[in-house]
Amino acid sequence: MLDALDWARLLLARVNQLQRWEGRCRIKGHALAAGLFAVVMLGLQLWKSWVLLAGYDQGIFQQVAWNSLHGRWFESSLSSQLSTNVVHAGELPFVGYERLGQHFTPTLLLWAPLLGVFGAAALPVVQVGLITAAGLVLHRLAAPRLPARTANWLVVAYFAGNALIGPTLGNFSDLCQLPLAVFVLMLGLLESRWALTVAGALLMPLIREDTGVILVAIGLWLLVRSRERWRLALVLIAWGGGWVVVCTNVLMPLFSDDNSKRFMVENFGQYLGADPDKGSSSLGVLKRVFSQPVLLVQQLIDPPGKTLRYLLGHSLPFLFVPLISLDTWLLAGPSLLGLFLAQGTNDPLAITIRYTWLVVPGFALGALFWWERRAVPSPGPRVRLAWGAALTLSLLLTVTSNPHRSLSMVMPDSISPWVHASPARQWSHGLGAREALKVIPETASVAANTPLVPLLA
């Protein structure tokens, strides 16, 4: 017969067993979210590629990677078509045009060999893989600082955001490397792991000519949150900001005038006065912006509705916590400032395009640090209910927006008038296009509309 003490011990053992089982389930929650995200995103990306829903930018990056793989570094005739020499001067596109004058992206060379292994599927694999890996590193950041449940909720919120899903389903972008670089650098800073710190800090500005701004933001955050490390903070600020200045004013003009005469004009032409077509350097634009404070304030808040929706869209999956976190504004503030001040044919405040990757890491980290500093860093039942509703709403808004027509096989592109092609018809369309391309001689020059560009690149 068991006495009362034996029963108590047995009950305690059972409780401990249940707690360990629950802990294991929670620990696996982030891996399940990452796996589901990767499978769905990659499946949709491959479907888009087959049915010709990938766009011009996808073709550019495939061409750049393929040419670089064969020793023609960063060359792209597709990028030449968009250059200022063609658009403004009326010249013909140039086969040997080097894209570094438009965007300075040395880290693309890391992924060029994969094009020889996976072919056209390489870039979707890289994009989905990097974004998924970033989520796993985010969990590695959160796990020692938050209860298991909160860490898992945070990672699920990261993967459920329209601001992450939308651009992941779009054309390949060099900015898909940014979230992983940010989280790796933060892991190195928080755990004093110098190898990760150096790797993240060195690679981040090399992703694109403007990503050094994120490094400046991290340096500012370090100055505020860890003042005893002010020397390291100043090094990060100097390296990130200095690289942006040198890259845009010295290195890129060596290849072309596209940055000053096209991108600065398209994105910040409203600050350049009566004759913006003359162009300006990044330093010149910065001077013009801050010399017009009334216009600056107007651009920051106008249009107010779109600006507010943009912030709410980023913060919705995190239950709006990033909006009240100082860390968010320190880490994402400089990027938000640039987006709010910019204009362009690609709306900088669209929640489903590549520019959101400049902001997503700051919002995720802002939520993480906010929960870490709470006396009770675990959401209660009511908060979990509200958070679950926010996650559901975020996913619902993402699906109904049909980002980059990724879900066009199950939902119409237009209701009035009704425009929808069945999956079978889309599949046969892609098959027919590939059959048609087989008759083109290998040495022939080719002109094509946008859906065929990735196939020909």
Question: Model segments located where?
Answer:
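Specific aromatic-rich, kink-prone transmembrane helix
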Residues: V137-L141, A157, C176-A201, L215-L223
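Membrane-lumen/periplasm interface segments of specific transmembrane helices
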Residues: M41-L44, L52, D57-I60, R231-P334, ...
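Short helix- or helix-capping micro-motifs
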Residues: A151-N162, A201-P205
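Start-transfer (signal-anchor) and selected internal transmembrane alpha helices
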Residues: M1-G43, A143, R231-V235
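Transmembrane-helix motifs of polytopic, lipid-linked glycan transferases
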Residues: P113, A121-R145, W153, V184
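Signature aromatic-anchored transmembrane alpha helix within multi-pass, membrane-resident enzymes
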Residues: A31-G35, R149-N152, I237-G241, R374-S408
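Hydrophobic/aromatic-rich transmembrane helices and adjacent perimembrane loops
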Residues: V128, T132, W329-R382
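Short acidic/glycine- and proline-prone juxtamembrane loop motifs at membrane-interface regions
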Residues: G166-L175
